[in-house]
């Protein structure tokens, strides 16, 4: 009975590995990472130089005196 259990576990691991290789598991993982790490790339963070072409993110304000986000 133990041999059958081990055999089934090995078969399950091999099957899932093969499915990842054939199914583009890396592409799916990269897409998931890109989606989760996506942010508003056009805005500037704290103390970054800002202008009309490179505005501060919504939660920061561009100082007219220093031209920096705060």
From Swiss-Prot:
**Keyword Secreted carried by entry:** yes
GO-annotated cellular components: extracellular region
Transmembrane portions of the chain: none
Positions bearing 4-hydroxyproline? 49
Q: Which InterPro entries match?
A: Conotoxin (IPR004214)
Q: Which residues form the propeptide?
A: 20-41
The PTM 6'-bromotryptophan maps to 59-60
Does Transmembrane helix appear among the keywords? no
In which domain of life is the source organism classified? Answer: Eukaryota
Cystine pairs annotated here are: 43-57, 50-62, 56-69
Share the record's PTM remark: Contains 3 disulfide bonds.
Q: Report any Pfam family annotated for this entry.
A: Conotoxin
Q: Where does the signal peptide begin and end?
A: 1-19
Indicate where this protein resides in the cell.
Secreted
Q: In which tissues is it expressed?
A: Expressed by the venom duct. All three forms are mostly present in part 5 of venom duct (distal part near the pharynx) and less abundantly present in part 4.
Query: Could you tell me one molecular function GO term of this UniProt entry?
Result: toxin activity
Q: Give the UniProt keywords, A-Z.
A: Bromination, Disulfide bond, Hydroxylation, Knottin, Secreted, Signal, Toxin
Family according to the record = Belongs to the conotoxin O2 superfamily.
Q: What does the UniProt entry state concerning the protein's domains?
A: The presence of a 'disulfide through disulfide knot' structurally defines this protein as a knottin.
Q: What is this protein called?
A: TxMEKL-P2
From which lineage does this chain's organism come? Eukaryota, Metazoa, Spiralia, Lophotrochozoa, Mollusca
